[in-house]
Amino acid sequence: MAVTVKSEHEIQLMREAGEILAKVHEELHAALKPGMTTLEIDRLCEKLIRGYDCIPSFLGYEGYPASVCVSVNDEIVHGIPSKKRVIREGDIVSLDTGVIWKSWQSDAARTWGIGEISKEAQDLIDVTRESFFAGLRFAKAGNHLNDICGAIGDYAEERGYGVVRDLVGHGIGTEMHEDPEVPNFRMNRKGIRLQAGMTLALEPMITIGTYEVDWGDDGWTVTTADGSLAAHYENTILITDGEPEILSLGKNDPDRVH
């Protein structure tokens, strides 16, 4: 496993990429409303990314046809935008997208409620986000990868939620997916020892029901096997000798209070 340690210059470029991606997510969130099609979300996302002189990293990646994955309700990840798919009041919508800035990448996902949503749905969104931060606390040089993975999964499972096994986080740099894989559940091994300068995408994918998944006929969309709601929260992070740095959070994002 070749896990790259980034230089200070490379980290700064990833930091800039993350700042841009955070702005894209903020603008997408502000635009979400009932009646939008998921294709409209994709077109806006691509326009925003290119407006910051970045490249949409998802577009064309392994044949993926859009700049953002838009996953609704029981869709966990990789929902393909469509002019036929309309988001409705009460839906929860996960937006997963990434940018390339001067050859360096950032990747982040958010799940939002559309209008008024159920308490069950809001609790799911909250626990998914909180499980990310439970894992982040262990993202320090000298710890092992499984310290992060176990903390994410334990947080969600202790609260009665399903933790998806078939999809995982990853390293990130000049490639969207680099070593190591970062599961959202406790492994039976320690995993690599974390070093300052490593960059990872932590992305809990949590369900109200089973952790088992179905793969869609389109070759991309992944749904919960039991039709239960799913949520997704992701950030690109930097391992340091002290506290980890979240590279894809806006300066005024309320999640910075964690």
Predicted regions and their residues:
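Active-site neighborhoods and metal-handling regions in enzymes and metal-associated proteins
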Residues: 1-258
